[in-house]
């Protein structure tokens, strides 16, 4: 058996050589360009399929200082938190709210303890 066979997938003892022809390859290819800090890396992939993958932010290699398109939403900004409900330190107000809660709930619950308010 010849160790160098054409059109044979690689196996444990064979070396794969792709078929050669006189006409240029007609398979589709695509390029992927990655720009990081002024360095551009171009990957050329032969025989790949085109797939669209939308991204939220992108920057070109020519203007790496750019943060992306003007219309792209910026998801890095923190959303403002809703205002928290202020608790009263007055024990009489706490007792009234506790009685209201007891009227609403019908299931028995453990007794509540008063919370201390610490002001800095």
From Swiss-Prot:
Primary localization class, coarse: host cell
Region entry Disordered, spans: 1-27, 56-120
Basic and acidic residues: compositionally biased ranges: 87-101
Keyword list, A-Z: Apoptosis, Early protein, Host nucleus, Host-virus interaction, Inhibition of host mitotic exit by virus, Modulation of host cell cycle by virus
Induction: VP1 and VP2 are detected 12 hours post infection, while VP3 only after 24 hours.
Annotated Gene Ontology cellular component terms: host cell nucleus
One GO process term, biological-process aspect: symbiont-mediated activation of host apoptosis
InterPro entries in the record: CAV_VP3
Location(s), subcellular: Host nucleus
Domain of life: Viruses
Regions of compositional bias (Polar residues) in chain numbering: 57-69
Record bears the keyword Phosphoprotein: no
Family listed: Belongs to the gyrovirus apoptin family.
Protein function: May act as transcriptional regulator. Induces apoptosis in infected cells. Element of infectious replication cycle.
Name of the protein described by the UniProt record: Apoptin
Organism: Chicken anemia virus (isolate USA 26p4)
């Amino acid at each position: 058996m010849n160790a160098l066979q054409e059109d044979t997938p690689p196996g444990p003892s064979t070396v794969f050589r792709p078929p050669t022809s006189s006409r240029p390859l007609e398979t589709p290819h695509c390029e992927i360009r990655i720009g990081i800090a002024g360095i551009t890396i171009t990957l050329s992939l032969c025989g790949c399929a085109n797939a669209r993958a939308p991204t939220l932010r992108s920057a070109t290699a020519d203007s790496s200082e750019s943060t992306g398109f003007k219309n792209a939403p910026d998801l890095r900004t923190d959303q403002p938190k809703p205002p928290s409900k202020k608790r009263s330190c007055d024990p009489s107000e706490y007792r009234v709210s506790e009685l209201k809660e007891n009227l609403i709930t019908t299931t028995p619950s453990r007794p509540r303890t008063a919370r201390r308010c610490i002001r800095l």
